[in-house]
Amino acid sequence: FPVGRDEALGQEWLLHCPGAVALARNNDPNSGGTEIYIVLDAQRYLDRNLTVFGRVIDGMEHVQAFKRGDRAISNGVIQAPEQGEEILGLTIVADLPEDQRPVWRTMTSEGEPFAEHKRALRVRESEFFYRKPPEVLDICSFNTPAERVAAAD
């Protein structure tokens, strides 16, 4: 997960990067509870104002294909449900019998493979760039790789 940090306050929080799953609410900070959303585009101004609690690790291409609302109207929230997309259901993996749960492996943040992954995102060496871009690491493009693996017998 992309994480923000305020070292002086000793606080950390998950960021509104593409694929983040967060809890929606009304104006009252304590009004959330039943509606969730998936961040489609980096919405960093929402950091620390709405709670991110998960991320999409598979199928984001389907989420990105959803119809979008006009940002000038209700901040892009589609007001006519029949014009939007409908999610017919979801499965909470923890509720599945253990032998039916998908198994995912994420890269550990220690060691050379992680350091190389981070370097490759920061240092752009592709022949595409006829002008070398600055060495920067965009936190929202820096997701830890995850892959689905066969369940252990």
Predicted region positions:
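Cross-family detector of peptidyl-prolyl cis-trans isomerase
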Residues: F1-D153
